[in-house]
Amino acid sequence: MTNLQDQTQQIVPFIRSLLMPTTGPASIPDDTLEKHTLRSETSTYNLTVGDTGSGLIVFFPGFPGSIVGAHYTLQSNGNYKFDQMLLTAQNLPASYNYCRLVSRSLTVRSSTLPGGVYALNGTINAVTFQGSLSELTDVSYNGLMSATANINDKIGNVLVGEGVTVLSLPTSYDLGYVRLGDPIPAIGLDPKMVATCDSSDRPRVYTITAADDYQFSSQYQPGGVTITLFSANIDAITSLSVGGELVFQTSVHGLVLGATIYLIGFDGTTVITRAVAANNGLTTGTDNLMPFNLVISTNEITQPITSIKLEIVTSKSGGQAGDQMSWSAKGSLAVTIHGGNYPGALRPVTLVAYERVATGSVVTVAGVSNFELIPNPELAKNLVTEYGRFDPGAMNYTKLILSERDRLGIKTVWPTREYTDFREYFMEVADLNSPLKIAGAFGFKDIIRAIRRIAVPVVSTLFPPAAPLAHAIGEGVDYLLGDEAQAASGTARAASGKARAASGRIRQLTLAADKGYEVVANLFQVPQNPVVDGILASPGVLRGAHNLDCVLREGATLFPVVITTVEDAMTPKALNSKMFAVIEGVREDLQPPSQRGSFIRTLSGHRVYGYAPDGVLPLETGRDYTVVPIDDVWDDSIMLSKDPIPPIVGNSGNLAIAYMDVFRPKVPIHVAMTGALNACGEIEKVSFRSTKLATAHRLGLKLAGPGAFDVNTGPNWATFIKRFPHNPRDWDRLPYLNLPYLPPNAGRQYHLAMAASEFKETPELESAVRAMEAAANVDPLFQSALSVFMWLEENGIVTDMANFALSDPNAHRMRNFLANAPQAGSKSQRAKYGTAGYGVEARGPTPEEAQREKDTRISKKMETMGIYFATPEWVALNGHRGPSPGQLKYWQNTREIPDPNEDYLDYVHAEKSRLASEEQILRAATSIYGAPGQAEPPQAFIDEVAKVYEINHGRGPNQEQMKDLLLTAMEMKHRNPRRALPKPKPKPNAPTQRPPGRLGRWIRTVSDEDLE
């Protein structure tokens, strides 16, 4: 991932390398952490076209090694003939021991002409087959297209001059490293002897019943009678072994058998011949055993193997013409392909067939393969290796993207020109902060955005080390807001006065302040500013935005912010408001992209992130803080907002910051605070009191500050501390709806009036409101107008309707719309709403429809959380509610769909149990018992480790259990008779004596005999 300070790009290197291998290798961000080096290997071949002008190139796009593919030319008899293998430029086993394939792409095209040919002819068909090479039934030029029904895995009739590109996409994840078949030190009498270490991971085994009491009978012939006992399809491009036995019985004396195994290539020719038995005489009346034990190394396999054949030659010692020969046989063989079942080794295969290319032309195969490689001991002395970085967010994002590759237009075979054009689209997919312009043009934007919302926040919540990935969620909205889009909670700011605001691209401006008239005055003083000439966004844009994430058990204080959208130099178009939370520390990963990178310093030099850099915040703080917009607050958590809120300007959040700095609460304080705290310890009043009050009430919070608030704390900081309420919230949402002393509908109207605008700010406005109410009582038409206004405000479309009115000054479009609207009793009205009147549409959906919509909403929310069994039908059967904790636990433990209306109380408090595999237990026991190369752990120690896993329900040992296991291992090692004897320790006080005769190289000591 990129640096946290980079706010424009957040690249996932792994998916970028997968989709564009030419950009270079990248470490796979899974949890297979071994020191490795990244290497990009090229493959370039110029293949000569045969006499028929047709040929076939077989690619193994996922093979983890040097083998890339093979080339075959079509003969005049209709059969293919093997030409050559396609490999990487460097022979990897010569320098490296282990390998993992990261990405691979190959391009096939022709741009050369033989003598006498003046135009490029020929076309190419390409297909990716999700099976092995031997499983293809029709490999002709046209028959290849029937190998798959997936349109993203085949292309046809591409001009040979344009070419095709083969892209390797992974079929599995979290794979281990593969041994490359590298040579190992060995000495033999034969100077040509070679010893290699081949991969034994995930072998592919073919079991062949060669004979089941097969009866053979024939007459003697000179040279013997040859039969094919069996022929079976296999696939192999790496080392293999054949094992098994056949049992022969005969009643004829003097029979002699010979057996030969043939490994046959894709073109039908014999690649390897091995004699299993020669002149093997059969004894009558008994079982004659013929064992098979063959090992074929990778070096002997010069082309892809697709079948195996066993021939039996029967002869008779001293036989004469007409002599009868007969025997019966039974037995089975097993063909083991080393590493054959490793994902990508033998399947899928991509076949590229060309036809009608001029004879003698050159077809160029060029590509790149990116690897993670572990060098051999000699190379490791001079090559630096590094661990891969575990990044669950990047890995999860890659998996989700590739799981939707058919919907996102990601193919395995491409026309080269189309693949080149898609590179910009692939860069958008790899960049989590990209605006997805090209993806939007193709209709993929919504899918990718949904994947981003699912992949990154979930991972950052489950894996705290991956929290920086939440920083990348969604798209940057700065290009929409402009450089000067800022929100304010205090004093006015005329941001358009800056020179950079005069950019021709920025033609909208969003301002937010507590003193709207001052903002207008400042804007009026900049008459030549071209910025303020339109409305950036209506409140509906913010209302329709999606939530980002939840922050659990985080201390926070809350304060409301008022946002003013200005249409022109004198008209405040709309008011909006948002609740913010103050969180300790630098937590830009929790902010929307529009706020990141912006901060203001306090008087003590610390930073408050989320504020516009406008001077200095008049506070003394002891640490850094971050302010983030929120959508909701619960008992111990807050719901973050993804709304494109610009940085804050002003001082009315100072009270919340000061409280956070002094008391440092451990959970969110359920009271909103407002007020500008000055250097003298006094709390100053702020404007837009009722709008902020309504903002707090919508979340069920009280508003605390100086003045006529829910909690009037007075203008002094000490008084504020004494009168400040405790943390618990003491009322529900929309508190005005249930007041007993109001008429039934008055509470709703009062709440809407409080949330709508600043009706109660001045006596003039209050008198105007009373005048309107009096006019409505005497004028039914005016009463209807007020009802329409309340309907627009309740549904949040006041600004939209105002914009529509500006575009339709004479109301022609509105009259046409109303004239063409379905009337009560009309055919279209009856088809949509039945025989009821026109008012049915205004009343909304029926209870049954609303219930179904609720079930669908619950199901979609569960789907975003990865709970896919909660379909709308299941939710309806479950009492129109989501899964209970017991149902979720039951599904997590058993992966079975829980029964609706069954609570599964036994699972609520039951600890999640899982079983550890024998391989996992053995690996843990080996790691604890000793380092690699030491003695293997005894079975008793393995049993002790297995007991720990059983106690921990499938999890590994904790610290105390690890100490006990280490002590047990030490005791067992001391009791082990095979352990090496300890070195004798010198006595601590005994002086060391110089051995006799070692005074020097040329000085001989004088003995007593010399003195005599």
From Swiss-Prot:
Effect of residue 652 to C: Partial loss of polyprotein processing
Impact when changing residue 512 to D/L/N/V: Lethal for the virus
Annotated stretches, region: Interaction with VP1 protein: 1003-1012
Active-site positions on this chain: 652, 692
Keyword Nucleus in record: no
Top EC class for this record: hydrolase
One annotated GO molecular function: metal ion binding
Mod. after translation: Specific enzymatic cleavages yield mature proteins. The capsid assembly seems to be regulated by polyprotein processing. The protease VP4 cleaves itself off the polyprotein, thus releasing pre-VP2 and VP3 within the infected cell. During capsid assembly, the C-terminus of pre-VP2 is further processed by VP4, giving rise to VP2, the external capsid protein and three small peptides that all stay closely associated with the capsid.
Domain of life: Viruses
Effect recorded for residue 513 to G: No effect on polyprotein processing and virus growth
Domain Peptidase S50: from-to ranges: 513-755
Protein name: Structural polyprotein
EC number: 3.4.21.-
Function: Capsid protein VP2 self assembles to form an icosahedral capsid with a T=13 symmetry, about 70 nm in diameter, and consisting of 260 VP2 trimers. The capsid encapsulates the genomic dsRNA. VP2 is also involved in attachment and entry into the host cell by interacting with host ITGA4/ITGB1.
Site feature location: Cleavage: 441-442, 487-488, 494-495, 501-502, 512-513, 755-756
Gene3D superfamilies: 2.60.120.20, 6.10.250.1030, Birnavirus VP3 protein, domain 2 (1.10.8.880), Capsid protein VP3, domain 1 (1.10.150.620), icosahedral virus (2.60.120.660)
Region (Disordered): 969-1012
Effect of residue 441 to E/Q/R: Lethal for the virus
GO annotations of cellular component type: host cell cytoplasm; T=13 icosahedral viral capsid
Comp. bias intervals (Basic residues): 975-986
PROSITE patterns (UniProt xref): BIRNAVIRUS_VP4_PRO (PS51548)
Protein keywords: Capsid protein, Host cytoplasm, Hydrolase, Metal-binding, Protease, Serine protease, T=13 icosahedral capsid protein, Virion
